Amino acid sequence: MPAIKIKDNIFSVGVLNPSLRIFDIIMKTEYGTSYNAYLIKGKKNVLIDTVHGRFFDEYLENIKSVIDPSSIDYVIMNHCEPDHSGSLARLYEVAPQIKVIASNAGKIYLKNITNKETLDVKAVKTNDTLDIGNGKVLKFAIAPFLHWPDSMFTILEEDKIAFTCDFLGCHFCEPRMFDTKITYMPKYEKSFKEYYDAIFSPFKPYVVKGLDILDALDLDFIATSHGPILTREGLLAASKQKYRDLSSEIQSTTKYIPIFYCSAYGNTEILANEIASGIKSVLNDANIEMLDIINYDYSDLKEKINICDAFMLGTPTINKDALFPIWELIGGIDAVNCKNKPASAFGSFGWSGEAIPFVISRLKELKLKVFQDGFTCLFVPSEDDIKKAFKFGEDFAKSI
């Protein structure tokens, strides 16, 4: 992708990666992505962010098509994740005169990301400014946990543009770089929501704070680090509202308690039903959802476990362990926002019964509010086991 002019003396110099299908191990990217970076020309020339290290050569050529790299004065690192900072060390080798600007956390991170002891990095704070001449003054706003502790926004009020790095971005490879030129809008909208879910949903209070910063500005453009640039005539307002809607806490007087389970021969399922009945006997108005997880899409289960008020996990023990679908679901728990959420586990076993102790241990490591040590029975639940399972559900409900 060649350099693209956004406004007079402001250019997109990032690169496309249309073949990317998995990002950061955790996220599918069906439509590829872009690593966006920006160049502002003034009396001082400024780069905003770099790109993934594998794409440095293309990135450098895009810069060269606008200015000589030796004339770059500053590189602003809004966020130091390697897909944005990965080319900084090599850029420094080509342009050793550069001065880097980052948040205080970013300054610390860059030392160990670049391993360049002589790299000049200055930390800024909210409302600090950088006058680059020609009537352009960059203003900084620290925006922690959007989505790293180092994140910040760079704002050019004179040109009504905010550079927000990952915030409001999307893994969507649009070569024409503007939201008004998106060809497959439903696919973009799907990717936009998936990006929020994977990257920003753990940080909803910080998302709201970031939106408040942007809402106080008169903006024609929001230039993100992935996906098309958001424009006033395009999706800028709608994208902000979508993030605000997704980050608003849903108030409900009805507790949502899903029971996730898998059951090889129906014995763990029997326990699941009795525990549910026990919970219902105490919390009559609770929404208790029974979920045999092999029949559901993982992304749906992940959303449920993270939005619920409390949950139970049921698994038999097979080959001295819990079953993979349960471990996969546990891997989807948002440890940031699920801290102290009531949870427990149950299951039938036939030989050694390690599954439930393992699951309980992991839930404790995630800092959930774990009820007792779970509940188990040997093979087929007896009448006494069924009564105890019901009581376990009752007691769990009382603990919520």
Curated annotation (Swiss-Prot):
Q: What GO biological process terms does the UniProt entry carry, in alphabetical order?
A: reactive oxygen species metabolic process; response to toxic substance
Query: Segment Zinc metallo-hydrolase: which positions?
Result: 32-216
The record's domain comment reads:
Consists of an N-terminal non-heme diiron domain and a C-terminal flavodoxin-like domain.
Q: Which residues bind Fe cation 2?
A: 83, 166, 226
Residues that coordinate or bind FMN: 263-267, 345-372
Which residues participate in Fe cation 1 binding? 79, 81, 147, 166
Q: Which CDD domains match?
A: flavodiiron_proteins_MBL-fold (cd07709)
**Protein's job:** Catalyzes the four-electron reduction of molecular oxygen to water. In fact, functions as the terminal component of an NADH oxidase (NADH:O(2) oxidoreductase) when using NADH:rubredoxin oxidoreductase (NROR) and rubredoxin (Rd) as electron transport intermediaries between NADH and FDP. Is thus able to reductively scavenge intracellular dioxygen and is part of an oxidative stress defense system in C.acetobutylicum, an obligate anaerobic bacterium.
What does the cofactor field's note say?
A: Binds 1 FMN per subunit. Binds 2 iron ions per subunit.
Q: Which domain of life is it from?
A: Bacteria
Q: Keywords, A to Z?
A: Detoxification, Electron transport, Flavoprotein, FMN, Iron, Metal-binding, NAD, Oxidoreductase, Stress response, Transport
**What is the organism field in this record?**
Clostridium acetobutylicum (strain ATCC 824 / DSM 792 / JCM 1419 / IAM 19013 / LMG 5710 / NBRC 13948 / NRRL B-527 / VKM B-1787 / 2291 / W)
Q: How does it assemble?
A: Homotetramer.
What broad class of enzyme is this? oxidoreductase
> What protein name does the entry list?
Flavo-diiron protein FprA2
Q: Which PROSITE patterns match?
A: FLAVODOXIN (PS00201), FLAVODOXIN_LIKE (PS50902)
Pfam families the record matches:
Flavodoxin_1, ODP
Leader sequence residues: none
Q: Which reaction does it catalyse?
A: 2 NADH + O2 + 2 H(+) = 2 NAD(+) + 2 H2O
UniProt GO MF annotations: electron transfer activity; FMN binding; iron ion binding; nitric oxide reductase activity; oxidoreductase activity, acting on NAD(P)H, oxygen as acceptor
Q: What induces it?
A: Up-regulated upon exposure to O(2). Repressed by PerR.
Needed cofactors, names only, are: FMN; Fe cation
Entry annotated with the keyword Metal-binding: yes
Query: EC no.?
Result: 1.6.3.4
- Membrane-spanning residues where? none
- Similarity comment: In the N-terminal section; belongs to the zinc metallo-hydrolase group 3 family.
Domain spans labelled Flavodoxin-like: 257-397
